[in-house]
C-alpha cells in the first residue's frame, strides 16, 4: 500500500505583495497599530488626571506630553491612518451588505452616502459638545 504525498502549496512571506488588492488590505489592517498608539495616549491622559492630587496638575502634565514633537507627529500619522481606514471601510461596506428594499437591492451610493452622513452628524455633535 502506497501513501500519496499530500500537496502543500508553497506560501512565501511576501505572498501579499503580488496583488494591489492584498497590499491595500495589509495597509488597511496595519492601521490598527496606530489605533493602539491612540489608546495608549488616552490611557496616559487618564493616568495623568487620576495620579495628581491637585486638579490642574494632571491636565498640565498631559498637555505637556501632547506638545512633544514626536507625539504630535505620531498623532498626525494616526489621523491619516484612521482616515484611510474609514475611507476604505466605507468603500467596502456597501459591497458586502445586501440591503433589500421592495425586492430590489439598495444602490452602493445610498449606503456609502448614509455612512458619510452619519459620520458627519456625529462629528458635528461632538464638536458642538466640546465647544459648548
From Swiss-Prot:
Pfam families: Fumarate_red_C. GO terms for molecular function: succinate dehydrogenase activity. SUPFAM superfamilies: Fumarate reductase respiratory complex transmembrane subunits. The chain crosses the membrane at residues 30-50, 70-90, 110-130. It comes from the Bacteria. Keywords: Cell inner membrane, Cell membrane, Membrane, Transmembrane, Transmembrane helix. It is a multi-pass membrane protein. It is found in: Cell inner membrane. InterPro entries: Fumarate_red_C, SQR/QFR_C/D. Gene3D superfamilies: Fumarate reductase/succinate dehydrogenase, transmembrane subunit. GO terms for cellular component: fumarate reductase complex; plasma membrane. Part of an enzyme complex containing four subunits: a flavoprotein (FrdA), an iron-sulfur protein (FrdB), and two hydrophobic anchor proteins (FrdC and FrdD). Anchors the catalytic components of the fumarate reductase complex to the cell membrane, binds quinones. HAMAP family: Fumarate_red_C. Belongs to the FrdC family. This is Fumarate reductase subunit C. The gene is frdC.
Amino acid at each position: 500500500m502506497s501513501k500519496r504525498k499530500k500537496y502543500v502549496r508553497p506560501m512565501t512571506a511576501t505572498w501579499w505583495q503580488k496583488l494591489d488588492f492584498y497590499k491595500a488590505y495589509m495597509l488597511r489592517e496595519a492601521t490598527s497599530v496606530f489605533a493602539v498608539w491612540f489608546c495608549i495616549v488616552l490611557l496616559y491622559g487618564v493616568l495623568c488626571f487620576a495620579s495628581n492630587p491637585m486638579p490642574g496638575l494632571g491636565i498640565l502634565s498631559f498637555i505637556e506630553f501632547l506638545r512633544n514633537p514626536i507625539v504630535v507627529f505620531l498623532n498626525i500619522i494616526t489621523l491619516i491612518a484612521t482616515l484611510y481606514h474609514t475611507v476604505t471601510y466605507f468603500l467596502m461596506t456597501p459591497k458586502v451588505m445586501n440591503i433589500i428594499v421592495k425586492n430590489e437591492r439598495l444602490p452602493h451610493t445610498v449606503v456609502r452616502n448614509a455612512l458619510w452622513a452619519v459620520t458627519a452628524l456625529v462629528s458635528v455633535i461632538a464638536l458642538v459638545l466640546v465647544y459648548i
